[in-house]
């Protein structure tokens, strides 16, 4: 996964990204000349320009949140109206990268300390609570990090913290890579999301860290035992992203969490073994794994049949048990799935369980398929049967509320999605939606090599009926002339 950007705009809501720039409050009016007015032709007409200062405080604070913290503080010099506005913004971003980029190396150490001291004052002067805080720092100010973390958690009750260590290189022998923080530094009840980039992981900051629901670790160095203990201490995790370089591969990495729903793993170095035991897991996103073996106990993903484990390496693969859960949760998952490692496009295969009668689930499937720019290797589809129970928090649209997604202006799948081989399980030829999906795969050239439909496990009568429907699929005009359609 690509190292997360620490810019203020990337950590803020996309809805604010198009906010117009601030206008100077002391520029009260401006002379504009116009030739369109017969009365005012050739005369100077004064129009008030500083309408932005008349906006409500909440709106001004949202606008300021789109700026870096340094720029937001500078706006306090515009007028009395702006003096305290920055002090209540819900998002703060401390970004020190420009110190290294724009100054000689001999001055970086001194300037870093000056900047850190000013940011300490800024944090102390801020009023109210924070939604998020991003700290992108360089190695010279590690002494300030612990103090800042305590301030933003205990005093500001920040919900989301992002820490990025901007250093030139990563080696296990450089001490400043270690994240030396106070015991239980990340254990404040308000903190629910934590992202760390380029650190050597230590356990003490995570003691009894049951408050975290989201943990993202990018370019992290850690012993397997330390990482296992950190995951165990974060007992309420729902989302876990691991991009790890292990220092000690002797033991097995254990991920045992009763609440974990999303797991994404990437590591370029060989490890011994990974053991996953997560009863609520619905997404297992493997970017790359090199290890002697792994085991996964996840009931919602156990029905998938395909195996992409070959010779100590797993091909990139995404397993997703689709359900119509809260949109905010699904949005977070999709954002993590679309993020790429080292700017590489998503490749490999996809396994999904989906009810194509449910428009909500079909919409989610559309979004997932859009993650592939190029041709997908394998697509495994497990159709949910009609008696599948509705999960907690899931909605289901029936009757006239259903829309036929294979009709209309934007049919699904679109004309650009391509996959080499599709494997279908629980296919019911009498189901209008399932047959329509298979038909589109055939006729518009979605599948380029094989469409494989599992029928051998059906009772004799159902097997005959299903294979008769498959025969109808074979009679359809093929988007790819040499497409092979088989029952197995």
UniProtKB/Swiss-Prot annotation:
Identification of the protein by name: F-box protein At3g60790
Stretches for region Disordered: 1-21
Coiled coil: none
Domain F-box: 49-95
InterPro entries assigned to the protein according to its UniProt record, in alphabetical order: F-box-like_dom_sf (IPR036047), F-box_AtFBL13-like (IPR053781), F-box_dom (IPR001810), F-box_SCFL_complex_component (IPR053197), LRR_dom_sf (IPR032675), LRR_FXL15/At3g58940/PEG3-like (IPR055411)
Species for this entry: Arabidopsis thaliana
């Amino acid at each position: 996964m690509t190292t997360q950007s620490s810019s203020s705009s990337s950590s803020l809501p996309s809805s604010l990204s198009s906010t117009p720039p601030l206008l100077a409050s002391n520029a009260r009016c401006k002379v504009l000349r116009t030739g369109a007015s017969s009365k005012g032709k050739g005369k100077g007409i004064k129009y008030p320009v500083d309408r932005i200062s008349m906006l409500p405080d909440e709106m001004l604070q949202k606008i300021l949140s789109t700026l870096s913290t340094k720029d937001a503080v500078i706006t306090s010099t515009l007028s009395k109206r702006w003096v305290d506005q920055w002090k209540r913004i819900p998002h703060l971003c401390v970004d020190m990268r420009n110190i290294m980029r724009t100054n000689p190396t001999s001055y970086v150490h001194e300037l870093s300390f000056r900047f850190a001291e000013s940011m300490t004052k800024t944090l102390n002067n801020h009023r109210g609570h924070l939604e998020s805080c991003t700290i992108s720092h360089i190695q010279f100010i590690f002494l300030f990090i612990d103090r800042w973390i305590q301030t933003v958690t205990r005093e500001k009750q920040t919900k989301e913290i992002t820490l990025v260590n901007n250093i030139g290189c990563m080696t296990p022998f450089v001490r400043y890579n270690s994240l030396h923080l106070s015991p239980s530094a990340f254990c404040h009840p308000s903190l629910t999301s934590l992202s760390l980039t380029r650190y050597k992981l230590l356990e003490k900051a995570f003691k009894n860290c049951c408050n975290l629901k989201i943990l993202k670790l990018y370019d992290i160095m850690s012993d397997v035992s330390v990482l296992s203990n950190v995951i165990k201490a974060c007992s309420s995790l729902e989302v876990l992203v691991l991009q790890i370089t292990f220092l000690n591969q002797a033991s097995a990495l254990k991920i045992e969490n009763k609440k974990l729903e999303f797991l994404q793993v990437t590591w370029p170095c060989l490890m011994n073994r990974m053991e996953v035991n997560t009863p609520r897991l619905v997404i297992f996103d493997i970017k790359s794994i090199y290890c002697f073996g792994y085991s996964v106990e996840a009931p919602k993903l156990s029905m998938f049949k395909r195996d992409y484990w070959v010779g100590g390496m797993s091909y990139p693969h995404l397993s997703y048990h689709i359900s119509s859960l809260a949109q905010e949760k699904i949005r977070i998952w999709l954002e993590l799935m679309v993020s790429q490692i080292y700017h590489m496009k998503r490749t490999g295969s996809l396994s999904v369980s989906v009810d194509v009668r449910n428009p909500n689930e079909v919409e989610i499937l559309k979004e997932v398929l859009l993650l592939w720019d190029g041709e997908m290797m394998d697509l495994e589809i497990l159709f949910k049967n009609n008696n599948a129970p509705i999960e907690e928090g899931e909605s289901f649209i029936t009757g006239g509320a259903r829309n036929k997604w294979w009709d209309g202006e934007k049919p699904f799948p679109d004309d650009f999605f391509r996959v080499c081989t599709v494997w279908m399980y629980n296919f019911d030829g009498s189901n209008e939606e399932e047959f329509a999906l298979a038909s589109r795969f055939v006729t518009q050239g979605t599948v380029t090599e094989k469409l494989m439909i599992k029928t051998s496990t059906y009772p004799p009568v159902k097997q005959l009926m299903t294979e008769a429907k498959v025969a109808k699929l074979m009679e359809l005009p093929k988007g790819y002339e040499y497409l092979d359609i088989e029952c197995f």
